[in-house]
Amino acid sequence: MASFDQMRANVGKLLRGIDRYNPENLATLERYVETQAKENAYDLEANLAVLKLYQFNPAFFQTTVTAQILLKALTNLPHTDFTLCKCMIDQAHQEERPIRQILYLGDLLETCHFQSFWQALDENLDLIDGITGFEDSVRKFICHVVGITYQHIDRWLLAEMLGDLSEPQLRVWMSKYGWMESENGKIFVCNQEENIKPKNIVEKIDFDSVSGIMASSQ
């Protein structure tokens, strides 16, 4: 099988050409989606092109490929990729399994119900078969949310939010983000006050720019 970089280059040429929405290219684009899933890579433009082709050619719709596209979009939170992809799927297909379950998982993540997300995922682990790095990508998003929300967080709560991590696993993520152990079972995330940088706006107005206004007011 061609390497991902080679496939990306080939697909990039295809998407720039007049055949961007030629249904004969669907097989190539669908293989590319599968390769992204296996190699923990991502190409939003190509994935949106697949969904657009499904819109134009409903008979060619593939539930499995669409599910992979949605799951890959979730790995790129907090960007809006998931919403973009969801809006290109008609309501009837959104009600199908596994798409319905994936949309539910996405809603839990976007509303920061992280413990509920891991519980729902645990009940549907088959959804992420073949999606390399999915869980760690989600953990990166959760750490992003924690980093902009908390100054201190309970150790047990952080472990739960990251999917009931063991102590060694939790330490790996703490080290990755530079979070320090604090007292009373808490973790120091950051000083949010230091992150608030007020912007001073200084507007310089020279005399020439107001002299006309002054003259007209006399």
UniProtKB/Swiss-Prot annotation:
Keywords: Cytoplasm, Initiation factor, Nucleus, Protein biosynthesis. One of its GO terms (biological process) is regulation of translational initiation. The keyword Transferase does not apply. Transmembrane segments: none annotated. One of its GO terms (cellular component) is eukaryotic 43S preinitiation complex. Pfam families: CSN8_PSD8_EIF3K (PF10075). It is found in: Nucleus; Cytoplasm. One of its GO terms (molecular function) is ribosome binding. Residues 42-204 form the PCI domain. InterPro entries: ARM-type_fold, CSN8_PSD8_EIF3K, eIF3k, PCI_dom, Transl_init_fac_sub12_N_euk, WH-like_DNA-bd_sf, WH_DNA-bd_sf. It comes from the Eukaryota. The keyword Cytoplasm applies. Its main location: nucleus. Component of the eukaryotic translation initiation factor 3 (eIF-3) complex, which is composed of 13 subunits: eif3a, eif3b, eif3c, eif3d, eif3e, eif3f, eif3g, eif3h, eif3i, eif3j, eif3k, eif3l and eif3m. Component of the eukaryotic translation initiation factor 3 (eIF-3) complex, which is involved in protein synthesis of a specialized repertoire of mRNAs and, together with other initiation factors, stimulates binding of mRNA and methionyl-tRNAi to the 40S ribosome. The eIF-3 complex specifically targets and initiates translation of a subset of mRNAs involved in cell proliferation. HAMAP family: eIF3k. Belongs to the eIF-3 subunit K family. This is Eukaryotic translation initiation factor 3 subunit K. It comes from Xenopus tropicalis (Western clawed frog). The gene is eif3k.
